[in-house]
């Protein structure tokens, strides 16, 4: 995707972000129009599950009832004492100003 080597989306210079996502949009349309696909799933891995150490994305063609099960939720139920609000606060504190 980007010609300049970057590993993570957060490493991509801000001026290149629009071009990256315009390219993603073009690829998504081509996959959905060129293949028998009802839709698609767009996936970017950062470090974990990143197959190559270079920013790239996957456009996965999808069809209703295609059998692909992809769920980002937990493999177990959340505990009622889940620290979601504490995590949200830590993320808000780490979020850089726009």
Please report, for each region that a protein language model flagged, where it lies by residue.
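HIT superfamily nucleotide-processing domains
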Residues: 1-98
């Amino acid at each position: 995707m980007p010609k300049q080597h970057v590993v993570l989306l957060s490493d991509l210079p801000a001026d290149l972000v629009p071009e990256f996502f315009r390219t993603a949009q073009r690829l998504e349309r081509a996959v959905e129009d060129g293949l028998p696909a009802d839709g698609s799933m767009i996936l970017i891995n950062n470090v974990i599950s990143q197959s190559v150490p270079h920013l790239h994305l996957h456009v996965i063609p999808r069809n209703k009832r295609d059998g692909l099960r992809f769920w980002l939720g937990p493999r177990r139920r959340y505990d009622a004492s889940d620290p979601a609000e504490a995590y949200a606060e830590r993320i808000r504190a780490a979020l850089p100003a726009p």
